[in-house]
Amino acid sequence: MRKVSISILFMLVSLTWGTTWLAMRIAVETIPPVFATGMRFMFAAPFLIIIAWLRKKTLLFPPGQRLFQFVICIFYFCIPFSLMIYGETYVNSGLAAIIFANMPVAVLIASVLFLNEKAKLMQIAGLTIAITALTGILLEETNTSTESHWQGITALISAVLIHAIIYTQCKKRSCTVSVITFNALPCLLAGLILSATGWFFERPQVSTFSVHSILATLYLGAFAGVFGILCYFALQQKANAFQASLVFLIFPLIAVSLEDYIYGYAISTHSMLLIIPLVIGIFLTLVARNLPVTSRCRDNSSQK
């Protein structure tokens, strides 16, 4: 029964992570990126706060870490999630998912730089293979696709790096709050900040918002932002760290397949072939590390 529940959770998380990239693309078709991200968090926050109330979880971090809670609001929610959806105005959702699948590699680099962790030989090999393969994919796609631009790629890579740095800071500060506490209040505050910022600077025309874009934003917030978090947290509790981390190898394939099926757009054959060494590199990084790629302070990465 435990294996069945792990398998179901793994599939749910993979599908959630894989579909969110397509949802972000649909959302920004008619809604400006910053305002769309604010809407996303505003949809998610009430559910998270209700769950916190039902489970009797505090909304505030422990004394001494409350300033860090605000840092998480800005540098975990506001900036990187805005960069993700902004990136998708220049990059197709499949390529965006492939870039974000390199989170384990970014976490390894950040851990070495900020936590003084020593990288194993296999980790270095995996990192080298993954970065080389990703570079090849990015060069191939920017040369062959009119939908892939360095402006979007830079935004997405920046989001990955910021999330990786926040992960290391959570670990360094021994941030052990529950997944609900970590997400609820920062999500609400981020929603308010981004909605206000988007309203004043992007000047969104609500009358032009399509039903598909609104539903996609609702999906990102209410489903991926709540259900996805809880499923990934449950997966981490039931499976070992390595098993849970394998989601990073699966969700990009789902994103690429969905975009091809719905939009008829597929990455080039060369890029598809380069996914093989990319997956191998990420796999080696995960195997060698044999530690959670995410922690309780990183569960919200399932909102991508």
Swiss-Prot record:
It is found in: Cell membrane. Residues 15-139, 161-287 form the EamA domain. Keywords: Cell membrane, Membrane, Repeat, Transmembrane, Transmembrane helix. One of its GO terms (cellular component) is plasma membrane. It holds the Pfam family EamA. InterPro entries: AA-Vitamin_Transporters, EamA_dom. It comes from the Bacteria. The chain crosses the membrane at residues 4-24, 34-54, 67-87, 95-115, 119-139, 150-170, 180-200, 214-234, 246-266, 267-287. It is a multi-pass membrane protein. Belongs to the EamA transporter family. This is Protein PagO.
